[in-house]
């Protein structure tokens, strides 16, 4: 959870710094994220593939392949949420299970700069209230949902990112 708070803080800080210096560009923002995240993700995947091939049974290998695709396209949080753990391999045989949080984070990185710039430019003096409202909405949403959705879907995690944004 603190990981998402930290990300909200860092990303909003980077965006504001770039705006204040007159050098924010979406392209540069996303290229920096790609250079920071993809090498570690692809290293993990490259190291996992041979072990998965050697150690997993056909059903587990199929699940691994699906989780690999979902990890590369940053929707592993949705993939693992919809996975039937009762009929699937053990979590111990899912080497990319930890990428659920990367999926949430990347979804935030894709959406947040656009929303942030809209609110920051139009409502600069009131943007903190808007981000606080998003934080409250996410907390209320958590209170109304008693399923695993709270763990895997970004709307239930937004309060953590927004807390980081508001700390900034």
Explain the meaning of each model-derived region.
Residues 1-168:
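Membrane-interface helix/loop caps of multi-pass membrane proteins
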